[in-house]
Amino acid sequence: MPRKGHVERREVLPDPVYNSKKVSKLINKVMWDGKKSLAQKICYGAFDIIREKTGRDPLEVFEEALNNVMPVLEVRPRRVGGATYQVPMEVRPERRLSLGIRWLVEYARQRSGKSMMEKLAAEIIDAANNTGGSVKKKEDTHKMAEANKAFAHYRW
């Protein structure tokens, strides 16, 4: 917690090709060691693969995938009298987006073989079709929230 008050959130600039802030955030999540041009190559390459495989606009497929991956509920730990309860809470819109993108990239990296372009494209296509690791992660998160519904009154 900063002593000097609230820290302003940085505005992410839209990417040069699709003019989308969401794509820009995806590029930033894929980026390692500050190598942004490499991350852009990976993302745009993945989008080209998506266009080839689906025959649809890759931005539409990406938006659909994000909507299928973004969680609505999550559990947060809360200590009450020596016991820690998992309290279900709604996820703020900015956090929903960042979690969705984070899970897409995380599960794309976990896929076996091939290049990162192909893995990212495959994960986005799977997520758009409501399958894949990132969608399973969202469903697990929702199941946890549903299972701990009894502790919802501990919200803060």
From Swiss-Prot:
Signal peptide: none
GO terms (BP aspect): translation
One GO cellular component term: small ribosomal subunit
GO MF annotation, one: structural constituent of ribosome
This protein's record includes keyword Transport: no
Keyword Zinc: no
Tree of life domain: Bacteria
UniProt cross-references to InterPro entries, sorted A to Z: Ribosomal_uS7 (IPR000235), Ribosomal_uS7_bac/org-type (IPR005717), Ribosomal_uS7_dom (IPR023798), Ribosomal_uS7_dom_sf (IPR036823)
Swiss-Prot/TrEMBL keywords: Ribonucleoprotein, Ribosomal protein, RNA-binding, rRNA-binding, tRNA-binding
Subunit field text: Part of the 30S ribosomal subunit. Contacts proteins S9 and S11.
Family classification: Belongs to the universal ribosomal protein uS7 family.
Cited function: One of the primary rRNA binding proteins, it binds directly to 16S rRNA where it nucleates assembly of the head domain of the 30S subunit. Is located at the subunit interface close to the decoding center, probably blocks exit of the E-site tRNA.
UniProt-listed NCBIfam families: rpsG_bact
UniProt name for this protein: Small ribosomal subunit protein uS7
Species classification: Bacteria, Bacillati, Bacillota, Clostridia, Thermoanaerobacterales
